[in-house]
Amino acid sequence: MAGATDQRRQEVLRAIVADYIASQEPVGSKALLERHNLKVSSATIRNDMAVLESEGYIVQQHASSGRIPTEKAYRTFVDSINDIKPLSVAERRAILGFLERGVDLEDVLKRSVQLLSQLTRQAAVIQLPNLNVSRVKHCEVVLLSPVRLLLVLITDNGRVEQRNVEVDQICEPEHVAKMRDVLNRALDNKTLSDASASLAELAAGEILVDPDIQPMILRCATVLIETLVEQPNDRLILAGASNLTHIAREMPSSLPAMLEALEEQVVVLKLLTNVRDLGHVSVLIGEENEDEQLRGTSVVTTGYGAQGATLGGLGVVGPTFMDYSGTMSKVYAVAHYVSRVLSGG
């Protein structure tokens, strides 16, 4: 759209979208004049609305009702959002404080989706880090009893895995110290795939170790390999699906498919896996979603990470009439502070 007339129609369209998002009620020309400083006559507004309707931006459900935006209108509205509005200092401080109370990586991520679902009143999702990009930070060996050990594997992005190991000989404290040293020399700062290869060498006896601890090292290496191999590359944490029940009246046909997609996870995981950039918020509206189950929804996503590397995606799934500006701001803010906490800042 170009020129003064087209610019005015853009303003009318933005006003219609904003009013419908706020009320979920059809918008008429009289209401637009009352709520917005459009500085034109009611007849001009009606003419603009007729043009917008002919161009596919708005529709009239009933002859006597106002207009509602189409997905084309929502896309134009989202594309007109030039800057993501920052949250208030109090909101940012509250987000950071809540996330910093997380005891480990998974707790931080659970807190992030709980918070995001509360802030946006939508369903919030986050992808746990792909372990293929993780590195082993430390392996701790704890003596629980003379024949039972606890192995604690810690990755550089804060992931913690714990496994109990039963051994076939009496384990002394000095054995524990030796095993800790052997395992950390084999694992330290290795990617998880390389760590698995090192553990396989230990299990096969290709790396020389003290004969006193070799059987126990074999058992520990086997358990750690199983731990690394069994971890799925992609897992999803979901919160706030119940928030979507409020849209049942406006979108009765979309809600079941939306809830099914969230429950199955595969569809949403595919979306989050494609998130690559930190700091960029992406919005998919209705038919822009490749998967049929999400074509009645809008999905707002971004990446989170540590030390500048993307670890996964997070976002919200909601109705096409969501508050796009507010949702984009909140998704961006939560991702920013998740990244900050994971980076140790």
UniProtKB/Swiss-Prot annotation:
InterPro entries: GAF-like_dom_sf (IPR029016), HrcA (IPR002571), HrcA_C (IPR021153), WH-like_DNA-bd_sf (IPR036388), WH_DNA-bd_sf (IPR036390), WHTH_transcript_rep_HrcA_IDD (IPR023120). It comes from Corynebacterium diphtheriae (strain ATCC 700971 / NCTC 13129 / Biotype gravis). Coiled coil: none annotated. GO terms for biological process: negative regulation of DNA-templated transcription. This is Heat-inducible transcription repressor HrcA. Keywords: Repressor, Stress response, Transcription, Transcription regulation. GO terms for molecular function: DNA binding. Belongs to the HrcA family. Negative regulator of class I heat shock genes (grpE-dnaK-dnaJ and groELS operons). Prevents heat-shock induction of these operons. The gene is hrcA. Pfam families: HrcA.
